[in-house]
UniProtKB/Swiss-Prot annotation:
The gene is sucC. Keywords: ATP-binding, Ligase, Magnesium, Metal-binding, Nucleotide-binding, Tricarboxylic acid cycle. Substrate binds at residues 264, 321-323. This is Succinate--CoA ligase [ADP-forming] subunit beta. It is an enzyme of class 6 (ligase). It comes from the Bacteria. The lineage of its organism: Bacteria, Pseudomonadati, Pseudomonadota, Betaproteobacteria, Burkholderiales.
């Protein structure tokens, strides 16, 4: 789950991280009111969407008068903001953050992530803040420094000080940087975050260290422990299909391709998408119906996939372990009839009650294309999507 910058800064404040004064605004008049409350002479008007690259897309403006705050708020609020993370369609800006201006001397980068290789939390830092960190990692990997944090001890003073020095924090400002890094770590740990990022971490001309941006992602499996985080959820920023899928306990993620995928098990789902791509196709979604799929869930899965206007074919790939193939077959038949399926459907199933499931599909009268292996299924669905 993602949250907005202003919400991330609320979390950082709770853990003692220095951030500029600012508030969200949902209208132009509210933006002006917030600016007047903050006082000048400089304000930053920021679009609030769940994507990076807002500045390059025109979603962050520096205002030097109340009139400019009004002008920029009017420009940004309601705009379709396109960044490298939104795709060409962009995201509509429904809220702003109005923040006091900052004296920027150094822009640094720090973040915390879970490293699956070391199975530890990793603190990363770079002197190249304010930029796309993926670009820095690709072109100048030597500028990214890492510290492995032991969960049993947390981020030690020496570790924080060492990283701060390596990324260019002046010696006199290292105690401030240490407090921010340790506060960021505590926020990451105590909220079950999967990402906590400050980009940029600013060092001002007088040596003051502040977090000018805040980005958090949270582990959805841990949200039951954090109702205060769930309260931050903004459904306007989420894919409507993914919201609908969550109501039926379906793991669904929209993609850019034209081949729908309905699979049981996340690992098999990813392998299925890889195989489709291997044969020249493009998956339209990730969809895991899980081990307890019912006819209703399969029907809803078909409805979700068919909401994609670019869908050209569907591949159902089932391994019947916990989930029986005859139950899936029943769901496929009911789902196909319920939605008046009008795109080619390829089905491959193996495992428990496989023969019964295949017979049910064959006797259904539906134009289902059967396959015995994942490779055959992928080849057939790619051909079907291409109209061959």
């Amino acid at each position: 789950m993602k949250i907005h910058e202003y919400q991330g800064k609320e979390i950082l404040r709770k853990f003692g991280v220095a951030v500029p004064r600012g508030k969200p605004a949902f209208s132009v008049d509210e933006a002006v009111k917030v600016a007047e409350e903050l006082g000048g002479p400089v304000w930053v008007v920021k679009a609030q969407i769940h994507a990076g690259g807002r500045g390059k897309g025109g979603g962050v403006k520096v205002a030097k008068s109340i009139e400019q705050v009004r002008e920029y708020a009017n420009q940004i609020l309601g705009m379709q903001l396109v960044t490298h993370q939104t795709g060409p369609e962009g995201q509509k800006v429904n809220r702003l953050m109005i923040e006091e201006g900052a004296d920027i001397k150094q822009e640094l980068y720090v973040s915390l992530v879970v490293d699956r290789v070391s199975q530890k939390i990793v603190l990363m830092g770079s002197s190249e803040g304010g930029m796309d960190i993926e670009e820095v990692a690709e072109k100048h990997p030597e500028l990214i420094h890492k510290v492995i944090v032991e969960p049993s001890t947390g981020l030690l003073d020496a570790q924080a000080d060492d990283l701060a020095a390596k990324i260019g924090v002046p010696a006199a400002s290292i105690p401030q940087a240490r407090a921010i890094l340790q506060g960021l770590y505590k926020a990451f740990w105590e909220t079950d975050a999967s990402l906590a990022e400050i980009n940029p971490l600013n060092v001002s001309g007088d040596g003051k260290v502040t977090a000018l941006d805040a980005k958090f992602n949270f582990d959805s499996n841990a949200l039951f422990r954090h109702p205060e985080i769930v309260a931050y959820r903004d459904l306007d920023e989420e894919d409507p299909a993914e919201i609908e899928a969550s109501k039926f306990d379906l793991a669904y993620i929209s993609l850019d391709g034209n081949i729908g995928c309905l699979v049981n098990g996340a690992g098999l789902a990813m392998a299925t998408m890889d195989t489709i791509k291997l044969f020249g196709g493009e998956p339209a979604n990730f969809l895991d119906v899980g081990g307890g799929a019912t006819t209703e869930k399969v029907t809803e899965a078909f409805k979700l996939m068919l909401k994609n206007p670019g869908l050209k074919a569907i591949l159902v790939n089932i391994f019947g372990g916990i989930m029986r193939c005859d139950v899936i077959a029943e769901g496929v038949i009911a789902g196909s009839k319920a939605v008046n399926l009008n795109v080619p459907l390829v089905v491959r199933m193996k495992g428990t009650n496989e023969d019964l499931g295949k017979k049910m599909l064959a006797d259904s009268g539906l134009p289902i294309i059967s396959a015995d292996s994942m490779e055959e299924a992928a080849q057939k669905v790619v051909a079907a999507a291409a109209g061959k």
